[in-house]
From Swiss-Prot:
The keyword Nucleotide-binding applies. One of its GO terms (biological process) is tRNA modification. It catalyses: adenosine(37) in tRNA + dimethylallyl diphosphate = N(6)-dimethylallyladenosine(37) in tRNA + diphosphate. It comes from Roseiflexus castenholzii (strain DSM 13941 / HLO8). Its EC number is 2.5.1.75. The gene is miaA. InterPro entries: Dimethylallyltransferase (IPR039657), IPT (IPR018022), P-loop_NTPase (IPR027417). Keywords: ATP-binding, Magnesium, Nucleotide-binding, Transferase, tRNA processing. Belongs to the IPP transferase family. ATP binds at G9, P10, T11, A12, V13, G14, K15, T16. This is tRNA dimethylallyltransferase. Monomer. GO terms for molecular function: ATP binding; tRNA dimethylallyltransferase activity. It comes from the Bacteria.
């Protein structure tokens, strides 16, 4: 069994700092479990580890595709499992680090995913329908053809709704019937970092302000100038979509920043629903004075590291 340390938690809780510390101490490498960090040129809005941080600890599954390229959950699972196997084969400790619930669950629970190639024709038709009739119409249709999948997907997550309908239309089989679970070949410990909501929200707000100071607005502008449009999954994600009204003259910059803080709070509230399902969880308060020592002890006890 391959030893695998997962470090999970809501956005801005402190996963990066802890994972870097543990990776340096236990000769590890980090596999990102963040659906936004796979995109090149989207650095500030996705809170990627800095170049200096990535120079000290090898990172995987960051800067994998351009913002206009498709990147599926199945592809992530394939690449992440390959990276974990490679890290372990070289005698190092793999750390799976992030907050994207589907990515974490696919790897840690061993999801057997439908290998249905993208169908641009079907997807384009569904995207047109979403644009003309709203995401609610697509969600209502999904509830008809695949109520199990609909129950797992938030009504506002149009991208996942479209993918579920795309798989159904391409195969005639609901996506929920094409997924099973096979326990993965890992000896897993999951460290779940937590914070009281008011403390976490304050951290989120401070990070948004730091992102703005670091040039987030210019990053978004640069992506638009490169030709990446708002309807791309990358550009419609958290940290970027909030600026669309500003660039289209429908909102002030202050309103866009306020919306980004609000949306990030909402996202952080929803993330724990995924974390609760993960295997072998140890919960640690992210603001504990002895956090590093407690995390180190967990790694030593679990993986017999020294």
């Amino acid at each position: 069994m391959i030893p695998l340390l997962a470090i999970v938690g809501p956005t801005a809780v402190g996963k990066t700092a802890l994972s870097l510390h543990l990776a340096r101490l236990f000769d590890g490498e980090i596999v990102s479990a963040d659906s936004r960090q796979v995109y090149r040129w989207m650095d500030i809005g996705t809170a990627k580890p800095t170049p200096a941080e990535r120079a000290t600890v090898p990172h995987h599954l960051i800067d994998v595709v351009d913002p206009d390229e498709d990147f599926s959950l199945a592809l992530y699972q394939d690449m992440a499992t390959a990276a974990i196997a490679d890290i372990a084969a070289r005698g190092k400790l793999p750390l799976l680090v992030g907050g994207t619930g589907q990515y974490l669950a696919a790897v840690l629970q061993g999801w057997q995913l439908p290998r249905v190639a993208p169908r641009p024709d079907i997807r384009a038709a569904l995207e047109r329908q979403a644009s003309e009739q709203g995401g609610e119409a697509l969600y209502a249709r999904l509830k008809e053809v695949d109520p199990i999948a609909a129950a797992r997907i938030l009504p506002g997550n149009v991208r996942r709704i479209i993918r579920a309908l795309e798989v159904y239309e391409a195969t005639g089989i609901p996506i929920s019937e094409q997924r099973s679970v096979q326990p993965p070949p890992y000896r897993i410990t999951t460290i779940w970092l937590t914070l009281p909501a008011p403390v976490l929200y304050a951290r989120i707000d401070a990070r948004v302000e730091a992102m703005m100071a670091a040039g987030l607005l210019d990053e978004v502008r640069g992506l638009l100038e490169r030709g990446y449009h708002w309807n791309l999954p990358s550009m419609s994600g958290l940290g970027y979509r909030e600026f669309r009204p500003y660039f289209e003259g429908r909102a002030t910059l202050e309103e866009a920043v306020t919306r980004l803080k609000y949306d990030t709070h909402t996202f952080a509230r929803r993330q724990p629903a995924w974390f609760r399902r993960l295997p072998n969880i140890v919960t640690l308060p992210a603001d504990a004075p002895d956090l590093l020592q407690r995390a180190e002890a967990i790694v030593r006890q679990t993986f017999d590291s020294s």
